[in-house]
Amino acid sequence: RDDARDDAEDEASAPHIHARARSRLFISDEYSRTVRLSEDLSYVQPTAPLPSWLKGFFVTAVSKGQDSVVQAAIEASNILNDYWFKVAYDAHRIDGEKPYERAKAMWIPGCDACAFVALRPDDNDANVYMCAKAIVEECRKGADWKQPTHVARIVPVEKSSSELELDALARDVLPKHFPPRGDSEPITFGIHYEEHSPMRHFSSTDVNRVVGSHVPDEGYKVDLKNPRFTICVVNAGGSMMMSVVEAYDALGHFNIHRAAFEDKLSDTVPGDDSAQPAA
């Protein structure tokens, strides 16, 4: 989608922002210059999901409160927009892959405890898992950029949908990661589900059943202790987000604050009070 068109629509829609939404999405001038929370989302009812075409990262903050979330969004987008980080990532791109040009932070409709950082333009081919993995690794060894003080986790998101369209989301995301295969040695996988201010609660059992049905029986098997692949599913506000990653536990569940400042990674999943334990 044309970002210039999106920006023009943003300007046109701004005067019609609902008063309640305007209040909920207010940030100070200091932050608005750095993180332009997408106004094309601000007037949408809280139950509307993130646009399905957005690719990026689910971001949580070290501290609670909207101010902390905004600061975390600033940090996450600044890391992704860092010149040297983009140079380092571009060096590992596949030939013909379209890179992202910038990272843009926005609220997740219906959830003010977390944020979303989208990679633009929307038709980029960036591997969000590789980006998040690189950030964790750089934080562990001490990157040139300022170490994160506000971001807790930066979880890759390949695609999102309404919370009621989980089945369609899994059908869209998983086939490229789990193609049919007849190898005698199965590839292991697990499913991790968590909730943050969900509009509706879903049990991990139900999510595992729906998502797991889109992984072929032949050539794959569930391993909850040491899976090669982890299907990450995040339910925040009215949005269901999904990605497939490797080494989820080894990467500390993408907690970059912990990677930067703590030597020993915890086995618990960081997040808000409503987050469910890993499956």
Question: What are the functions of these language-model segments?
Answer:
Residues 1-279:
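SAM-dependent transferase fold signal centered on methyltransferase-like domains
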